[in-house]
Amino acid sequence: YTLSLHDALPILLIVALGGMFSERSGVVNIALEGIMIMGAFSSILFINIVQSSGAALPPQLLLLLAVLIAAAVGVLVSMAHAYASINMKADQVISGTAINMFAPAFAIFAARMIRSVQQIPFSNTFRITKVPVLGDIPVLGPLLFQNTYITTYLGFAVLAVSAVVLYKTRFGLRLRACGEHPQAADSVGVNVYRMRYAGVAISGALAGVGGLVFVVPTSTNFNATVAGYGFLALAVLIFGQWRPSRILFAAFFFGLMKTVASAYSGIPFLANLGIPNDVYKMVPYVATLIVLAFTSKNSMAPRAEGIPYDKGSR
């Protein structure tokens, strides 16, 4: 999967910000990878069905409808994690792992049952060759407004909205309170269970959309994988200290590493080194290990993250 930086960055931004909402509410969500797969599967299946039917929908409208479907399915899948974690007080890591294991198997099975194929094909007509006016801006035009997708800008929109919601709204204040001091939040009338469900639902919606955002620029079929971007988004979340502004920086760093790993052959200096292809593929994950080794000790995770809330305990 070859991605440019301006394609990889929105994926990591959207999914990491989704994880932020869940974990800020106090629920660990390592199911991001599985939710991405389910969101991508459902939305690509929708695109495949519409394109196969011959319906004359404008490409960008079709893509936006697919985004809504990916978000809806992401919410639906995340509710299974929310119920297990919040109501049943199950181990949140185990619950997330179960979804990660279930999603690719289900996607392959459903694709075979519904379309009689393992890989769901679609026609990629969504690329925007050039944004009028903006595409003519020197330097920035070719970088951001040529040969791009509408989903590229979605990542930055999600970043702006997330920052406002988290720090400038009553909802954001209550969400953060439930992740830090749920008993205190409950004592002033905040429904901790409801807020945690909301956090996980937002997380699921964004992760589902992130799955679609991954598939559209990389391929013309979906084969039940998102190349580990869900796990990489968790590293972005931790490195970004659960804060939108820092998550942007972390997403840029890891997106750059992922881009180098997938497009090194187009960089003359790296291509001439004679280093095996597999070594470059390791770069983003080795970088993840190194960064987390140096930053995890000082990470400021929400205090109640991963701790099931019991209304009767104080």
Predicted regions and their residues:
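Hydrophobic alpha-helical segments embedded in the membrane of multi-pass proteins
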Residues: 10-20, 34-38, 76-79, 179, ...
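Transmembrane helix-bundle core of multi-pass membrane transporters
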Residues: 103-168, 269-279, 299, 304-314
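Alpha-helical transmembrane segments within multi-pass membrane transporters and channels
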Residues: 56-104, 160, 253, 258
